[in-house]
């Protein structure tokens, strides 16, 4: 019978998530992770197997709490284009001013270029693309898109725009300009409806 965990798993995953967002996977040292989680290296390895196991758990926590939470809050089923607009605008109001960036975006860049994308990155981008497509089909013009081609193409374009916004926010781009770009994009989509 295994030992029960004697730590607050949510707090540990949140701390690790912060370090991976700040330093990336390669740049996150065990010492950084120890400080952020309050666990010693041996406890990290015992609980998660290795650094990759902790990363996977922290990334899963990020996808559940940050990504899915943001979608549920701003673009739930039935919210259509307005929900997507709100989802995009919400990116401009991060508590850390976007300085840590998005874990999904950061890891897509760090792990990119390999033969196989990281499964957590692939799943997160897939969730965004699917959410965009589903909210688009709630708009009248996309509802008439019998085979879904137009909604799929637009969802991919919005995914590229969303990820680009996250990079620009992390790079310190003027948020007023980014807000106007978001408004312009969704105003154009609404005129198509």
Where are these regions (language model features)?
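Short hydrophobic clusters on alpha-helical segments that form packing/core surfaces
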Residues: 12-20, 91, 132, 162
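Helix-turn-helix
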Residues: 11, 19-53, 57
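N-terminal intrinsically disordered/low-complexity leader segments
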Residues: 1-7, 140-147, 193
């Amino acid at each position: 019978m295994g030992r029960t965990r004697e730590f607050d798993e949510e707090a540990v995953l949140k701390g690790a998530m912060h370090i991976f967002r700040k330093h990336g996977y390669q740049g996150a040292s065990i010492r950084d992770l120890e400080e952020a989680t309050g666990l010693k290296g041996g406890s990290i390895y015992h609980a998660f197997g290795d650094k990759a196991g902790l990363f996977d758990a922290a990334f899963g926590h990020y996808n559940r709490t940050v990504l899915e939470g943001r979608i549920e809050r701003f673009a739930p089923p039935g919210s259509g284009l307005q929900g997507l607009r709100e989802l995009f605008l919400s990116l401009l109001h991060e508590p850390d001013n976007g300085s840590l960036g998005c874990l999904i975006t950061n890891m897509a860049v760090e792990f990119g270029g390999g033969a196989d994308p990281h499964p957590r990155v692939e799943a997160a981008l897939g969730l965004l693309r699917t959410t965009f497509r589903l909210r688009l089909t709630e708009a009248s013009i996309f509802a008439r898109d019998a085979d879904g081609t137009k909604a799929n193409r637009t969802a991919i374009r919005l995914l590229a725009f969303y990820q680009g916004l996250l990079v620009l926010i992390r790079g310190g781009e003027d948020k007023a300009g980014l807000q106007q770009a978001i408004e312009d994009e969704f105003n154009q989509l609404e005129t198509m409806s």
